[in-house]
Design a protein with these regions (language model features):
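Alpha-helical transmembrane spans of integral membrane proteins, capturing the lipid-embedded, hydrophobic core
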Residues: 29, 33, 58-66, 70, ...
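Alpha-helical membrane-inserting segments
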Residues: 39, 64, 68, 72, ...
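Small-polar-interrupted transmembrane alpha-helices in polytopic inner-membrane proteins
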Residues: 59-73, 123-136
């Protein structure tokens, strides 16, 4: 099933140069826009103390997710779909390990941590994470399961970092603590 879904999505690559440019943009440049936009949003927060708290939780969650993804890739290497001769590769990845997707893990941790503070922004960042993951499958550098696993791992880490922060530093006012 993983391979079937991959081939269906990857078959969209190479059909139209403009579509390929958009895929490349969402897979490689769009993530920087999301990070920059989030940084501006959190740094210019009207309540500086809450903005600093939100920034600390979100950055910690994203960094922890990135570290976990790197660790899994190191200990459980899994080749990218680009090793198949039928794969249409639109760009070259940084490394040859695909599981889990570091991008999916990182960008799933952001909305998971943000959700508890800024639900509307978290929704848009979750949509951004979906676009990034889809583009990385279409671009031929990730299997669908790599992306799905990244979303699950990132979501758990994002929520977990929020939970740990609340346990040690926050007032237990959120409904999950009641």
């Amino acid at each position: 099933m993983n391979e079937t879904i991959f081939h269906a999505l990857n078959s969209l690559a190479g059909q139209n140069w403009l579509f390929d440019k958009w895929v490349n943009f969402f897979a490689n440049q769009f993530p920087y826009l999301l990070i920059g936009g989030l940084g501006v949003f959190l740094v210019t927060h009207k309540d500086k103390k809450k903005g600093a708290r939100d920034l600390a939780v979100v950055v910690t969650a994203a960094f922890a997710a990135w570290l976990v993804a790197r660790g899994i890739k190191y200990f459980f290497p899994h080749e990218r779909p680009s090793v198949l001769h039928t794969t249409k590769v639109l760009f070259v990845p940084d490394d040859m390990q695909s599981f889990p997707s570091g991008h999916a893990t990182f960008f799933a941790a952001l909305p998971a941590a943000l959700y508890f503070y800024h639900k509307r922004i978290a929704f848009w960042y979750a949509a951004g994470a979906l676009l990034i993951g889809l583009a990385r499958i279409i671009g031929g550098i990730h299997w669908p399961f790599d992306i799905l696993a990244g979303y699950v791992i990132g979501g758990i880490i994002g929520g977990g970092v929020y939970y740990v922060y609340q346990m040690y530093f926050g007032l237990r006012t959120h409904k999950i603590f009641k």
